[in-house]
Amino acid sequence: MVEQKVCIALVSGGIDSPVAVARMLREGWSIHPVHCSQEPITGPEAEQKTIAALRYFLEIESPLGDLARQNLSRELTVIPVAQQLSLFTEKWCHTEYFIHMKRLYCGLGDLVGTQKGATHLLTGENLGQVSSQTLGNLGAIEMMTSLRMLRPLLGIDKTVIMHMAQSMGTYELSLGPEVCDALGPSLPTTVANLEWLEKSEERAGGFQNLVEEAWKNHRIVQL
């Protein structure tokens, strides 16, 4: 029996994640998209861009569109995380803010994955592009999910990713200011200290509690 390929996709509203989704659709994966919303810290633009890109896949008349209509879920899970992220703006943990953010996202992806029967977590991460995506931090991030990681863009140059987005039609939909760093530090750490991360999360109420509290306010957007 061929194992069904099911993943949870963390879709941010930026340029990279729709490209990652498209690559995995072409590889035959069934995809359940998740968007972690930072409203009201930010505006609704990130969610709007996420919805626009996913609907584009479902509507285009092309081989990619055919794959999306077959394997991309028409339900986008939106999870508000602003309250949880604001806890990591204190002086004692702010330099690790982006790592805590991605760890939280992985924990939420894990929760959705359990419900959907997924085996993998898909991200648009690109090695070294930002602080949370250094080799020193990726391990500390992915340990918060039992799902295996799919990072199809990890070693691809950013300019190549932009060209890929342009060629498939999502680049314009994803343009706009990056909002994930709204509360982020000016000098983020590039090498995580796991013991300190865990102590900071415990001080903020405990990692599992942060995940559960964020999940209480999740909603479903029909694509």
Residue ranges and their predicted role:
Residues 29-30, 72, 117:
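Short loop/turn motifs at secondary-structure junctions
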Residues 2-53, 186:
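ATP-dependent adenylation/pyrophosphate-handling site
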Residues 85-86, 91-168, 220:
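Active-site adenylate/phosphate-handling loop in enzymes that bind or generate adenylated species
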Residues 55-63, 114-115, 166-170, 188:
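Generic secondary-structure signature for well-ordered alpha-helical cores
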Residues 9, 33-35, 78, 123, ...:
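Structural beta-sheet core signal
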